[in-house]
């Protein structure tokens, strides 16, 4: 019985690999299977962008550079190509990276909970909806501002702010990174945050002082600004 169980497990793995390989061939024109599901997803996206005639480098602010290096094994100079952020993207990237914190995960109750009806609300298709909302952005024409209203609306914006929510605010929305890397959402403090977070905070009557802010505009229509990068992918 155990031998049969083991053989069955091997069969399941083999069948899964065969189907995954066929899926990869259909959607990426490649017979090799990436080691992870996310790797396969990236390959599918790149394949779809190529089919649409969309430049990955232009869309995401990358460029290909050629460098000359000394190869100790060959004992000679070799030429190597690499994909790197454009110079204009590189200017804002360190600051923008500080403003990204990932999802908000919190626990509001510790220990036994009261007997009651508990509701867990979720946004249907939140990730795919967020992806479809993204359009090409103009990395070369970013601009700085301390005007809080510039961060309201459909804006690609990032800022370092001092903030203070009203004392009776139950759930403040601006993230502050702790010394251990965790996130806190205090009534007041200093936050690296994004335009949507700023707009929500303003809607909660939060007092803001923008110390440093950058806006990266969407591309104009003639430069592909009307296209949705991930629409076909999702």
Question: What would you call each of these model-derived segments?
Answer:
Residues 1-234:
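Conserved acidic
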